[in-house]
Amino acid sequence: MNDLNDFLKTILLSFIFFLLLSLPTVAEADVTNKVNYSKDVIYQIVTDRFSDGNPGNNPSGAIFSQNCIDLHKYCGGDWQGIIDKINDGYLTDLGITALWISQPVENVYALHPSGYTSYHGYWARDYKKTNPYYGNFDDFDRLMSTAHSNGIKVIMDFTPNHSSPALETNPNYVENGAIYDNGALLGNYSNDQQNLFHHNGGTDFSSYEDSIYRNLYDLADYDLNNTVMDQYLKESIKFWLDKGIDGIRVDAVKHMSEGWQTSLMSEIYSHKPVFTFGEWFLGSGEVDPQNHHFANESGMSLLDFQFGQTIRNVLKDRTSNWYDFNEMITSTEKEYNEVIDQVTFIDNHDMSRFSVGSSSNRQTDMALAVLLTSRGVPTIYYGTEQYVTGGNDPENRKPLKTFDRSTNSYQIISKLASLRQTNSALGYGTTTERWLNEDIYIYERTFGNSIVLTAVNSSNSNQTITNLNTSLPQGNYTDELQQRLDGNTITVNANGAVNSFQLRANSVAVWQVSNPSTSPLIGQVGPMMGKAGNTITVSGEGFGDERGSVLFDSTSSEIISWSNTKISVKVPNVAGGYYDLSVVTAANIKSPTYKEFEVLSGNQVSVRFGVNNATTSPGTNLYIVGNVNELGNWDADKAIGPMFNQVMYQYPTWYYDISVPAGKNLEYKYIKKDQNGNVVWQSGNNRTYTSPTTGTDTVMINW
C-alpha cells in the first residue's frame, strides 16, 4: 500500500511540475512594478463591449440595447466578463500583462437628446462611486485580485477635464453636468455657485489656449484653477489608487493646462506612484512640439499618435512608406526624452479599426508584429486579435462576439508578448535601421548584448536582401514567429554580415538573441519626476544581487530594495532641478547614466500667474522666470510660456497656470521675447509671492 501511495505521489508531483513548466512566460511579469510597463503588452477594453459576465447588472429601459443593436447605448459588458476571460485563459494565453479598462466611476444615467449614453465611461457623475452597470466595489476588488494573481496589471481611464454634456441655457439637458462627491452634490453647470466649471462656450480648436479653457463639444469643462475642484479630483484619483489600480490613462490632456496636470502627477507620485499616460490626439501626419514638451515636462507619458498614424498610413491606407516610418522612429527618439515609455498602438476607440475585412487580415498581422517589436509600450485594442472591423465611433466599438485563440493575430501577439518578457532589447533597446526602401524595413533593437532583428516586406513580391549587417552574433537564426508571416532563417557571419536571402511578399520575420548583461545597464526609470523622499524604481540588468548605490549626479540615494534587475530608492534631498542617474554595483562598476530625472522643489500646487498692461509688438510673447526650477531658475532660455491672452483674460493681460512648490516664497519677473530670441526684462525689483500650501491660487500684478 505504501509503495502505491509513493507511486501516486510521484505521478502527482510530476503532473504539478509539468503544469508549472507549461505556464506562459508572461506569468513572470512583475505586477508589483507599477511604474515600468516597458516589457508589458496592454490590452484596451471598452468595458461595456467586451463580455457580459453578469446580465443581472445590465441597465433597463431606453439606455440599454438588447444584443447591442444600437451601438450608442449600453450593451452589458462588465467587470465579471473581464474576470471570466482572465480565468478561462483567453487574456493570459494572449500574453496580456496589463488591462486598460473604461473609467470605472459612476456616469450619468440620462439619455442624451441624440440617443447617446455614457456606456463608454467618459461622462462622470461621481468619481467616488462605481458605474453600477460595470459592477460594484466587490466586483472591482475581485477584478483587481484576479488580474494580479494572473500577472496582469490594471490601468483605469480617468477624465479630469469634464463631467458630462450640459447647456448653459437648459438645466434639463442630460444631467446638467452635475458632479457629486460620494453622493453629495458639488454643483452643476447652469447653477454653478462654486464656479466649478468654465463658462466660455465651446472650443473651435483654433489654439492651444482655446482648447484648454473652453468646452470640448458640449461637455461641462472643469475650472481646474478652482480649489474645490482641484482637491476633489486629486482626492478621487487617490481613492482609486488605494483600491489598487496599477496605472492611469488620462483623457484629453491637450484640453487641460500642463501646470495643473503636473501638480496632479506630483500628487500621484507622492501617494502611490503608477505609470500614467495621457491622450493628446494627433491627426495623420501631424507633428506638434507642444505634444513633445508635455510628454517631457508634465510627468506623464502619452499615447504615441505619431507612431499609430504612421503605421496605419504605411500598412492600412498605403499613403506612406517605410522611409516615412523610419523618419518617425528617428525623430521621436530625439523629441521624446523617454521614448520607450510612450504608448503605441495601431487602432483604438477614437479611430476606425485597422482591419477592414478578411482581405486585410495579413496587414493587421504585419502591423501587430511591427507594433510588438518597436520601441514604446504596445497596446492592443480589444478585438483586433479577432480582426474586428468598423469605421469611426461607434462602429469601432462593437461588442466582441468571438474569442478564438487560433487566429493568426492571436498567435502572433502571444509569441511576441512572451518575447518582450524574455528579451530586454524589446523593452529597453535603441532602434537602428539596417535595411530600407519604400517596401522593406529591417530594424534592430539592442540593449547590451541582447538583440532583436525584425524584417518587414510590405510589397506583393519576394525581395532579395543583400548587404545586410547586424549585431547578432555569428550563427543561424530561425524566425521567432515560426513562419506565421512567412519568415525565414538567416545566417550571420563572424563580421555581422548576413548571407543574402529571399524576404517573401507581405512577410515579417523576427530573429533574436537574449544575452542579459552582467554589467549594470539602466533600462527604465519610473517615474521620471518626484520630490525628495519620493520612491522611484530603476529597472535594467546587471545590478547584481548585493547592494551597491544609485547616484543622482554624485549624490547617493537611500536604497529601499535591490535585485539584479530592479532597484527602489528614495529621491535624495537635493535642490530642485535635473539629475543624471547611475547605478554603481557592489563591485564598483558604474552604469551609463540615465538622463535628466526631474527633482521637484517640494509638494506642488497649481497657480495662475498673470500680468496686466503688458503690451507687445507682433511676434513677441510674454514669459515668466523665477527663483525655483519650476520657474526656470532665472534662466531666460528656460522661462515658462509663452503665456496666454485670449480666453480667461484678454490682451494686454497675460496669464499662465504653472505648477510650483507649495508654501514657498517665490521671486519672479516677466520677460518679453521676440521671434529672434531677444529678451526684455520687467523693470524694478523681483516680484515676490508665497504659494499656498494646498489648493490653487491666482496672483495678478501690473507690468
From Swiss-Prot:
It is found in: Secreted. GO terms for cellular component: extracellular region. Binds 2 calcium ions per subunit. Residues 599-703 form the CBM20 domain. GO terms for molecular function: alpha-amylase activity; cyclomaltodextrin glucanotransferase activity; metal ion binding; starch binding. Residues 1-29 form the signal peptide. This is Cyclomaltodextrin glucanotransferase.
